[in-house]
Amino acid sequence: MPNIFEPHFDEPREHPGFDCRRARIGRQAGAERLGASVWEVPPGQAAYPYHFHYAEEELLFVLAGRPSLRTPEGWRELAPGDAVAFPVGERGAHQLVNRGEDAVRLLVVSPAGVPEICVYPDSGKVGIYDRAPIEGLRELYRRGDAVDYYEGEEPPAV
């Protein structure tokens, strides 16, 4: 049985500045339409790039540490026990950074099982993701690479 205080981290993320670990607690518990993840972010690292979602609202709980939260309103420090909601769309944009000396632990809850589109404003990317139980599609593009709806399409023979 999964435990948020002793999680089995099943998704390491290793990229300079974004090293962290994720335990997909919801999936480990057998949830199909509800996601819950414990994130552990070492000092000097970010959990993920600044982004917002089009389909998934998120609810974040700080379990340990004092992460810095970036939103459209700016930066602020969170404390253990704080809860923050990130609605869909630009107003829900967020990023968590550990500027402290101890590891940060977060619990994030969101819907699962729906395709998701994420926008990364700092890098001008858009991500398209399938979610469990389907999974498979995970692609990122520069927003400037957009093409016309009909590009490459030929009308059917009549």
Segments predicted by a language model, with ranges:
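A short, N-terminal "cap"/entry segment at the start of jelly-roll beta-barrel domains
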Residues: 1-33, 119-158
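Conserved short histidine dyad/triad with adjacent acidic residue
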Residues: 20-22, 37-53, 91
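A short beta-loop-beta micro-motif enriched in histidine and acidic residues
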Residues: 26-34, 45-58, 74
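Ligand-binding loop in jelly-roll beta-barrel domains
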Residues: 30, 88-115
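Short, conserved beta-strand element in jelly-roll/cupin
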Residues: 38-42, 53-71, 109-113
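A generic structural motif
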Residues: 47, 57, 64-66, 73, ...
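Short acidic-glycine-tyrosine-enriched beta hairpin
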Residues: 72-88
